[in-house]
Design a protein with these regions (language model features):
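Positively charged, structured surface patches that bind polyanionic biopolymers
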Residues: 1-109, 113, 132
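Arg/Lys-rich, low-complexity, intrinsically disordered N-terminal tails that contact nucleic acids
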Residues: 112-135
């Protein structure tokens, strides 16, 4: 499970501060949803209702997120290196500068693999030490 990171200035950033309450909720929920699903900041249009299930008419608030610059259309290239490349085969949105604070899918998977290998080594070493002490 990846952790979600927020800067302590997040709530007063000029782009976020101008969002309606519903758009703010959608934006923050999208960050959590993207982290949980390893989506690299991409919110597919067909999954928008899943991102913030209690929000009515989420497409309206997605449009507000785009207008305020916290999201952009998934087909639009962003000059920021902190945004994933445009998504060609799906409609949706990208959380702008997602990689500024959130790890990439690739990094999360690599970290999981590293921890799994370390856990296996720890278990082997632990079992060997118990057998040696029993002698």
């Amino acid at each position: 499970m990846p952790w979600v990171r927020f800067d302590d200035q997040f709530t007063i950033h000029r782009k976020v501060d101008g969002l309606s309450d519903a758009a703010y909720r959608l934006h923050t929920s999208a960050i959590f949803w993207c982290a949980r699903n390893l989506m690299d900041g991409f919110v597919p249009e067909e999954d928008l209702d899943l991102v913030c299930a209690r929000l009515r008419a989420p497409a309206r608030f997605a449009a507000e997120c785009v207008k305020r610059g916290v999201w952009h259309d998934a087909h639009t290239a962003c000059p920021s290196e902190k945004c994933p490349a445009p998504v060609d085969n799906h409609d949706g949105w990208v959380v702008h500068d997602y990689w500024e604070y959130q790890p990439t899918r690739e990094k999360v998977l690599a970290d999981r693999e590293t921890k799994a290998k370390a856990g296996q080594k720890g278990g082997i070493a632990s079992g060997q030490s118990r057998r040696l002490h029993a002698l």
